[in-house]
Protein backbone atom coordinates (compact mmCIF):
# COMPACT_ATOMS: atom_id res chain seq x y z
CA UNK A 1 0.00 0.00 0.00
CA UNK A 2 2.90 2.37 0.65
CA UNK A 3 4.30 4.69 -2.03
CA UNK A 4 6.79 7.54 -2.22
CA UNK A 5 4.24 10.12 -3.37
CA UNK A 6 0.88 9.05 -1.96
CA UNK A 7 -2.36 10.19 -3.54
CA UNK A 8 -4.19 12.10 -0.82
CA UNK A 9 -7.29 12.86 -2.90
CA UNK A 10 -10.34 10.65 -2.38
CA UNK A 11 -14.10 10.91 -1.94
CA UNK A 12 -15.51 10.38 1.54
CA UNK A 13 -17.98 7.61 0.66
CA UNK A 14 -17.76 4.34 -1.23
CA UNK A 15 -20.32 5.43 -3.85
CA UNK A 16 -18.64 7.53 -6.53
CA UNK A 17 -21.78 9.62 -7.09
CA UNK A 18 -24.59 10.72 -4.76
CA UNK A 19 -28.12 9.35 -5.07
CA UNK A 20 -31.00 11.36 -6.53
CA UNK A 21 -33.09 13.17 -3.86
CA UNK A 22 -30.11 13.20 -1.50
CA UNK A 23 -28.90 16.42 0.15
CA UNK A 24 -25.18 17.02 -0.36
CA UNK A 25 -22.74 19.69 0.78
CA UNK A 26 -21.38 21.92 -1.99
CA UNK A 27 -19.11 24.91 -2.43
CA UNK A 28 -19.90 27.46 -5.12
CA UNK A 29 -16.99 27.81 -7.58
CA UNK A 30 -18.27 29.92 -10.46
CA UNK A 31 -21.43 31.72 -11.57
CA UNK A 32 -22.11 31.45 -15.31
CA UNK A 33 -24.91 32.58 -17.67
CA UNK A 34 -27.24 29.65 -16.97
CA UNK A 35 -26.40 28.84 -13.38
CA UNK A 36 -23.72 28.19 -10.79
CA UNK A 37 -20.97 25.58 -11.01
CA UNK A 38 -20.23 23.95 -7.68
CA UNK A 39 -17.95 21.32 -6.13
CA UNK A 40 -19.46 18.39 -4.20
CA UNK A 41 -17.26 18.42 -1.10
CA UNK A 42 -18.10 14.87 0.00
CA UNK A 43 -17.35 13.41 -3.43
CA UNK A 44 -13.79 14.59 -4.00
CA UNK A 45 -14.96 17.93 -5.38
CA UNK A 46 -16.60 16.55 -8.54
CA UNK A 47 -18.50 19.24 -10.42
CA UNK A 48 -22.22 19.88 -10.29
CA UNK A 49 -24.50 22.64 -11.52
CA UNK A 50 -27.39 24.60 -10.04
CA UNK A 51 -29.57 26.24 -12.69
CA UNK A 52 -30.84 29.70 -11.78
CA UNK A 53 -34.39 28.32 -11.91
CA UNK A 54 -33.44 26.00 -9.01
CA UNK A 55 -32.14 28.73 -6.73
CA UNK A 56 -35.41 29.86 -5.18
CA UNK A 57 -39.15 29.20 -5.16
CA UNK A 58 -39.71 32.95 -5.37
CA UNK A 59 -39.07 35.31 -8.24
CA UNK A 60 -35.35 35.99 -8.47
CA UNK A 61 -34.53 39.68 -8.27
CA UNK A 62 -30.83 39.33 -7.57
CA UNK A 63 -28.78 36.17 -8.15
CA UNK A 64 -25.97 37.51 -5.94
CA UNK A 65 -28.32 37.62 -2.95
CA UNK A 66 -29.08 33.90 -3.34
CA UNK A 67 -25.71 32.42 -4.19
CA UNK A 68 -22.13 33.60 -3.77
CA UNK A 69 -18.79 32.21 -4.90
CA UNK A 70 -17.10 30.41 -2.00
CA UNK A 71 -20.29 29.77 -0.04
CA UNK A 72 -20.69 26.26 1.44
CA UNK A 73 -24.24 24.94 1.85
CA UNK A 74 -26.47 21.87 1.38
CA UNK A 75 -28.40 21.36 -1.88
CA UNK A 76 -30.61 18.59 -3.30
CA UNK A 77 -29.50 16.19 -6.05
CA UNK A 78 -31.93 16.27 -9.01
CA UNK A 79 -30.20 14.19 -11.69
CA UNK A 80 -27.00 12.18 -12.00
CA UNK A 81 -25.55 11.10 -15.36
CA UNK A 82 -22.78 8.72 -14.31
CA UNK A 83 -21.57 8.16 -17.88
CA UNK A 84 -21.09 11.83 -18.67
CA UNK A 85 -20.42 12.88 -15.09
CA UNK A 86 -23.20 15.48 -15.04
CA UNK A 87 -24.89 16.29 -11.73
CA UNK A 88 -27.85 18.68 -11.57
CA UNK A 89 -28.61 20.21 -8.19
CA UNK A 90 -31.30 22.35 -6.58
CA UNK A 91 -31.17 24.85 -3.78
CA UNK A 92 -34.90 25.61 -3.70
CA UNK A 93 -35.96 21.98 -3.14
CA UNK A 94 -33.88 21.30 -0.04
CA UNK A 95 -35.94 21.43 3.17
CA UNK A 96 -34.87 22.57 6.64
CA UNK A 97 -34.84 18.93 7.75
CA UNK A 98 -32.65 18.01 4.76
CA UNK A 99 -30.27 20.84 5.62
CA UNK A 100 -29.91 19.72 9.23
CA UNK A 101 -29.37 16.07 8.28
CA UNK A 102 -26.81 17.00 5.63
CA UNK A 103 -24.88 19.32 7.93
CA UNK A 104 -24.70 16.70 10.70
CA UNK A 105 -23.51 14.01 8.28
CA UNK A 106 -20.99 16.32 6.62
CA UNK A 107 -19.46 17.47 9.90
CA UNK A 108 -18.94 13.85 10.95
CA UNK A 109 -17.58 12.86 7.54
CA UNK A 110 -15.23 15.85 7.44
CA UNK A 111 -13.69 14.85 10.78
CA UNK A 112 -13.29 11.23 9.64
CA UNK A 113 -11.75 12.41 6.37
CA UNK A 114 -9.32 14.72 8.16
CA UNK A 115 -8.12 11.89 10.40
CA UNK A 116 -7.81 9.43 7.50
CA UNK A 117 -5.93 11.95 5.36
CA UNK A 118 -3.49 12.76 8.16
CA UNK A 119 -2.73 9.06 8.69
CA UNK A 120 -2.27 8.52 4.94
CA UNK A 121 0.06 11.50 4.67
CA UNK A 122 2.07 10.51 7.75
CA UNK A 123 2.61 6.92 6.56
CA UNK A 124 2.88 7.70 2.82
CA UNK A 125 -0.20 5.62 1.98
CA UNK A 126 -2.71 6.35 -0.77
CA UNK A 127 -5.81 7.75 0.91
CA UNK A 128 -8.13 5.64 -1.25
CA UNK A 129 -6.34 2.45 -0.13
CA UNK A 130 -6.97 3.47 3.47
CA UNK A 131 -10.64 4.04 2.70
CA UNK A 132 -10.97 0.74 0.81
CA UNK A 133 -9.47 -1.29 3.65
CA UNK A 134 -10.70 0.65 6.69
CA UNK A 135 -12.95 3.65 6.09
CA UNK A 136 -15.65 2.27 3.81
CA UNK A 137 -15.94 -1.10 5.61
CA UNK A 138 -16.55 0.88 8.82
CA UNK A 139 -19.26 2.92 7.06
CA UNK A 140 -20.94 -0.36 6.06
CA UNK A 141 -20.65 -1.93 9.51
CA UNK A 142 -21.56 1.08 11.66
CA UNK A 143 -23.69 3.27 9.41
CA UNK A 144 -21.02 5.97 9.63
CA UNK A 145 -17.29 5.66 10.26
CA UNK A 146 -17.64 8.42 12.87
CA UNK A 147 -19.63 6.03 15.09
CA UNK A 148 -16.91 3.40 14.72
CA UNK A 149 -14.22 5.96 15.57
CA UNK A 150 -16.07 6.83 18.81
CA UNK A 151 -15.88 3.18 19.87
CA UNK A 152 -12.28 2.97 18.70
CA UNK A 153 -11.24 5.60 21.27
CA UNK A 154 -11.61 3.04 24.08
CA UNK A 155 -11.71 -0.33 22.27
CA UNK A 156 -9.75 -0.30 18.99
CA UNK A 157 -9.47 -4.08 18.67
CA UNK A 158 -13.24 -4.61 18.58
CA UNK A 159 -13.51 -2.14 15.69
CA UNK A 160 -10.41 -2.93 13.64
CA UNK A 161 -10.00 -6.63 14.46
CA UNK A 162 -12.80 -7.94 12.19
CA UNK A 163 -11.54 -6.00 9.14
CA UNK A 164 -9.76 -8.12 6.53
CA UNK A 165 -8.48 -7.74 2.97
CA UNK A 166 -7.51 -10.13 0.22
CA UNK A 167 -4.02 -10.36 -1.25
CA UNK A 168 -2.75 -12.51 -4.09
CA UNK A 169 0.43 -14.54 -3.77
CA UNK A 170 2.24 -17.10 -5.89
CA UNK A 171 2.31 -20.47 -4.16
CA UNK A 172 5.13 -23.05 -4.13
CA UNK A 173 3.60 -24.68 -7.19
CA UNK A 174 3.72 -21.45 -9.14
CA UNK A 175 -0.04 -20.95 -8.98
CA UNK A 176 -1.56 -17.66 -7.83
CA UNK A 177 -3.51 -17.99 -4.61
CA UNK A 178 -5.71 -15.55 -2.69
CA UNK A 179 -5.06 -15.06 1.01
CA UNK A 180 -7.21 -13.24 3.56
CA UNK A 181 -5.12 -11.11 5.92
CA UNK A 182 -5.90 -8.40 8.52
CA UNK A 183 -6.81 -5.15 6.80
CA UNK A 184 -4.88 -3.06 9.32
CA UNK A 185 -1.17 -3.36 9.97
CA UNK A 186 0.20 -2.50 13.41
CA UNK A 187 1.78 0.65 11.99
CA UNK A 188 -1.50 1.88 10.53
CA UNK A 189 -3.41 0.85 13.66
CA UNK A 190 -1.07 2.79 15.95
CA UNK A 191 -1.23 5.93 13.80
CA UNK A 192 -5.01 5.72 13.43
CA UNK A 193 -5.69 5.14 17.13
CA UNK A 194 -3.33 7.96 18.11
CA UNK A 195 -5.03 10.43 15.76
CA UNK A 196 -8.56 9.40 16.71
CA UNK A 197 -7.85 9.64 20.43
CA UNK A 198 -6.28 13.06 19.98
CA UNK A 199 -9.18 14.39 17.91
CA UNK A 200 -12.19 12.59 19.39
CA UNK A 201 -11.58 12.03 23.10
CA UNK A 202 -14.42 14.01 24.75
CA UNK A 203 -13.23 17.20 26.42
CA UNK A 204 -15.02 18.45 29.54
CA UNK A 205 -16.98 21.66 29.02
CA UNK A 206 -17.25 24.42 31.57
CA UNK A 207 -20.69 25.40 32.86
CA UNK A 208 -21.09 28.76 34.59
CA UNK A 209 -23.73 30.81 36.39
CA UNK A 210 -23.45 34.40 37.61
CA UNK A 211 -25.20 35.45 40.82
CA UNK A 212 -25.41 38.36 43.25
CA UNK A 213 -25.18 37.36 46.91
CA UNK A 214 -25.92 39.81 49.73
CA UNK A 215 -26.44 39.62 53.49
CA UNK A 216 -26.49 42.81 55.59
CA UNK A 217 -27.37 41.08 58.87
CA UNK A 218 -25.01 40.70 61.82
CA UNK A 219 -22.35 38.09 60.92
CA UNK A 220 -23.26 38.50 57.24
CA UNK A 221 -19.83 37.23 56.20
CA UNK A 222 -20.39 34.00 58.13
CA UNK A 223 -23.80 33.49 56.53
CA UNK A 224 -22.41 34.08 53.02
CA UNK A 225 -19.62 31.62 53.73
CA UNK A 226 -22.18 29.03 54.85
CA UNK A 227 -24.27 29.60 51.70
CA UNK A 228 -21.20 29.19 49.49
CA UNK A 229 -20.23 25.94 51.21
CA UNK A 230 -23.75 24.57 50.71
CA UNK A 231 -23.60 25.55 47.04
CA UNK A 232 -20.33 23.65 46.57
CA UNK A 233 -21.78 20.68 48.48
CA UNK A 234 -24.43 20.32 45.75
CA UNK A 235 -21.71 19.11 43.38
CA UNK A 236 -20.53 15.54 42.97
CA UNK A 237 -17.45 13.69 41.78
CA UNK A 238 -18.42 14.05 38.11
CA UNK A 239 -19.54 17.69 38.46
CA UNK A 240 -17.66 19.43 41.30
CA UNK A 241 -19.01 22.92 41.96
CA UNK A 242 -16.77 25.91 42.69
CA UNK A 243 -17.91 29.40 43.66
CA UNK A 244 -15.71 32.49 43.39
CA UNK A 245 -16.04 36.20 44.01
CA UNK A 246 -15.82 38.55 41.01
CA UNK A 247 -16.56 41.79 42.88
CA UNK A 248 -19.03 42.26 45.74
CA UNK A 249 -21.79 41.27 45.43
CA UNK A 250 -21.14 39.34 42.17
CA UNK A 251 -20.08 35.68 42.34
CA UNK A 252 -19.66 32.95 39.71
CA UNK A 253 -20.46 29.26 40.12
CA UNK A 254 -18.65 26.85 37.80
CA UNK A 255 -18.38 23.16 37.09
CA UNK A 256 -16.71 21.02 34.42
CA UNK A 257 -18.43 18.01 32.90
CA UNK A 258 -18.73 15.86 29.78
CA UNK A 259 -22.53 16.07 30.05
CA UNK A 260 -23.83 19.60 29.45
CA UNK A 261 -27.35 18.92 30.74
CA UNK A 262 -26.04 17.29 33.91
CA UNK A 263 -23.72 20.24 34.53
CA UNK A 264 -26.56 22.76 34.17
CA UNK A 265 -28.76 20.69 36.49
CA UNK A 266 -26.02 20.51 39.15
CA UNK A 267 -25.40 24.27 39.04
CA UNK A 268 -29.12 24.96 39.36
CA UNK A 269 -29.17 22.73 42.46
CA UNK A 270 -26.17 24.62 43.83
CA UNK A 271 -27.96 27.95 43.29
CA UNK A 272 -31.07 26.58 45.03
CA UNK A 273 -29.00 25.40 48.03
CA UNK A 274 -27.23 28.75 48.22
CA UNK A 275 -30.56 30.63 47.99
CA UNK A 276 -32.18 28.56 50.72
CA UNK A 277 -29.27 29.11 53.10
CA UNK A 278 -28.88 32.85 52.59
CA UNK A 279 -32.63 33.52 52.79
CA UNK A 280 -32.84 31.86 56.22
CA UNK A 281 -30.50 34.65 57.39
CA UNK A 282 -32.54 37.37 55.62
CA UNK A 283 -29.99 37.63 52.84
CA UNK A 284 -30.73 37.69 49.12
CA UNK A 285 -29.51 35.85 46.02
CA UNK A 286 -30.25 37.15 42.51
CA UNK A 287 -29.38 35.10 39.42
CA UNK A 288 -27.77 37.50 36.93
CA UNK A 289 -27.07 34.86 34.27
CA UNK A 290 -28.32 31.30 34.58
CA UNK A 291 -26.28 28.12 34.18
CA UNK A 292 -24.93 27.76 30.64
CA UNK A 293 -21.93 26.38 28.76
CA UNK A 294 -19.17 28.94 28.30
CA UNK A 295 -16.29 29.14 25.84
CA UNK A 296 -12.59 29.62 26.48
CA UNK A 297 -13.03 33.23 25.34
CA UNK A 298 -15.72 33.81 28.00
CA UNK A 299 -13.44 32.36 30.68
CA UNK A 300 -10.51 34.45 29.51
CA UNK A 301 -12.61 37.61 29.71
CA UNK A 302 -13.77 36.70 33.23
CA UNK A 303 -10.19 36.01 34.37
CA UNK A 304 -9.01 39.35 32.96
CA UNK A 305 -11.92 41.15 34.63
CA UNK A 306 -11.15 39.53 38.01
CA UNK A 307 -7.45 40.40 37.68
CA UNK A 308 -8.32 44.04 36.92
CA UNK A 309 -10.63 44.24 39.93
CA UNK A 310 -7.95 42.74 42.16
CA UNK A 311 -5.43 45.31 40.91
CA UNK A 312 -7.91 48.16 41.47
CA UNK A 313 -8.53 46.93 45.03
CA UNK A 314 -4.79 46.83 45.75
CA UNK A 315 -4.38 50.41 44.50
CA UNK A 316 -7.27 51.57 46.69
CA UNK A 317 -6.13 49.75 49.84
CA UNK A 318 -3.72 52.52 50.84
CA UNK A 319 -6.45 55.17 50.69
CA UNK A 320 -8.83 52.98 52.70
CA UNK A 321 -6.25 52.38 55.44
CA UNK A 322 -5.48 56.10 55.84
CA UNK A 323 -9.08 57.33 55.64
CA UNK A 324 -12.05 56.96 57.94
CA UNK A 325 -13.26 53.41 58.51
CA UNK A 326 -16.10 52.56 56.11
CA UNK A 327 -19.32 50.86 57.07
CA UNK A 328 -19.15 47.04 56.97
CA UNK A 329 -21.54 45.73 54.32
CA UNK A 330 -21.51 42.21 55.73
CA UNK A 331 -20.11 40.86 52.47
CA UNK A 332 -16.57 39.98 53.48
CA UNK A 333 -13.71 39.29 51.09
CA UNK A 334 -13.29 36.07 49.23
CA UNK A 335 -9.78 34.72 48.91
CA UNK A 336 -9.64 34.20 45.14
CA UNK A 337 -6.57 31.99 45.32
CA UNK A 338 -8.26 29.71 47.84
CA UNK A 339 -11.42 29.31 45.76
CA UNK A 340 -14.44 29.64 48.04
CA UNK A 341 -12.55 30.59 51.19
CA UNK A 342 -13.43 33.87 52.90
CA UNK A 343 -11.10 36.21 54.73
CA UNK A 344 -12.81 37.56 57.82
Swiss-Prot record:
Record bears the keyword Protein biosynthesis: yes
Asked whether the UniProt record includes Zinc among its keywords, one would answer no
Q: Where is the S1 motif domain?
A: 21-92
The UniProt entry, under PROSITE patterns, shows: S1
Could you tell me the superkingdom of the organism this chain comes from? Eukaryota
Among InterPro entries, the record links this protein to:
NA-bd_OB-fold, S1_domain, S1_IF2_alpha, TIF2_asu_C, TIF2_asu_middle_sf, TIF_2_asu
User: What are the boundaries of the region Disordered?
Assistant: 312-344
- What post-translational changes are documented for it? Phosphorylated at Ser-56 by GCN2.
Q: Which UniProt keywords apply?
A: Initiation factor, Phosphoprotein, Protein biosynthesis
Q: Mark out the compositionally biased spans (Acidic residues).
A: 314-336
Q: Name one GO cellular component term.
A: nucleus
GO molecular function ontology, one term from the record: translation initiation factor activity
* SUPFAM superfamilies for this protein: eIF-2-alpha, C-terminal domain (SSF110993), eIF2alpha middle domain-like (SSF116742), Nucleic acid-binding proteins (SSF50249)
Record-listed Phosphoserine modification sites: 56
Family assignment from sequence similarity = Belongs to the eIF-2-alpha family.
Assembly, in brief, is: Heterotrimer composed of an alpha, a beta and a gamma chain.
- Primary role: Functions in the early steps of protein synthesis by forming a ternary complex with GTP and initiator tRNA. This complex binds to a 40S ribosomal subunit, followed by mRNA binding to form a 43S pre-initiation complex. Junction of the 60S ribosomal subunit to form the 80S initiation complex is preceded by hydrolysis of the GTP bound to eIF-2 and release of an eIF-2-GDP binary complex. In order for eIF-2 to recycle and catalyze another round of initiation, the GDP bound to eIF-2 must exchange with GTP by way of a reaction catalyzed by eIF-2B.
What protein name is recorded for this chain? Eukaryotic translation initiation factor 2 subunit alpha homolog
Q: Which organism is it from?
A: Arabidopsis thaliana (Mouse-ear cress)
Amino acid sequence: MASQTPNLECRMYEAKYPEVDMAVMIQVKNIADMGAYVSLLEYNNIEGMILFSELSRRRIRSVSSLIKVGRIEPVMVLRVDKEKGYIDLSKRRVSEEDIQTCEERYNKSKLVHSIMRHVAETLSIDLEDLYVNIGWPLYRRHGHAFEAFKILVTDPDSVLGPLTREIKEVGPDGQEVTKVVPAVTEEVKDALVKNIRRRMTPQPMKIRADIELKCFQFDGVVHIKEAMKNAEAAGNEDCPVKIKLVAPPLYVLTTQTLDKEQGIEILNKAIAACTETIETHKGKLVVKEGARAVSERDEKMLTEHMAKLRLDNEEMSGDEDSGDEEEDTGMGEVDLDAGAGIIE
